[in-house]
C-alpha cells in the first residue's frame, strides 16, 4: 500500500475546510490539515502575484489518489489549482495502516 501527502493551496481557510471535509467524509482522504496565512508569490497571466492563501494537506493512498485530485478540481475555484502528491517513504506503520483503513483499503 503506497500512501501520499497531498499538498493543496486554496484561496482561504473557508475553502480549505470545505474541500478537506468533503475529502474526509467521502473517504478519499483519511484526514486533512489546514495551515492558514501562507504567503504565495508567483506569476499568473504575466502578472506578479503576492497573495495570502491557505494550505490543505490530505493523506491518502494510491488507489484513491486520482479520485481525490478530481474531487479537489471540481470544488476548487482556481482555474489551475495546486494539487501535488508526495509519496510517504517511511512512517509509523500503525498510522500508515490507519490511513489505508480510513480510505477503504
What does each of the following model-derived ranges do?
Residues 1-105:
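Positively charged, small/polar-rich N-terminal and surface patches that mediate targeting and assembly
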Amino acid at each position: 500500500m503506497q500512501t501520499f501527502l497531498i499538498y493543496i493551496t486554496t484561496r482561504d481557510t473557508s475553502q480549505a475546510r470545505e474541500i478537506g471535509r468533503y475529502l474526509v467524509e467521502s473517504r478519499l482522504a483519511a484526514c486533512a490539515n489546514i495551515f492558514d496565512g501562507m504567503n504565495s508569490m508567483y506569476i499568473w497571466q504575466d502578472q506578479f502575484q503576492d497573495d495570502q492563501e491557505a494550505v490543505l494537506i490530505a493523506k491518502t493512498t494510491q488507489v484513491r489518489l486520482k479520485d481525490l485530485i478530481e474531487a479537489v478540481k471540481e470544488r476548487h475555484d482556481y482555474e489551475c489549482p495546486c494539487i501535488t502528491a508526495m509519496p510517504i517513504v517511511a512512517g509509523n506503520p500503525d498510522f500508515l495502516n490507519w490511513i489505508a483503513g480510513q480510505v477503504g483499503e
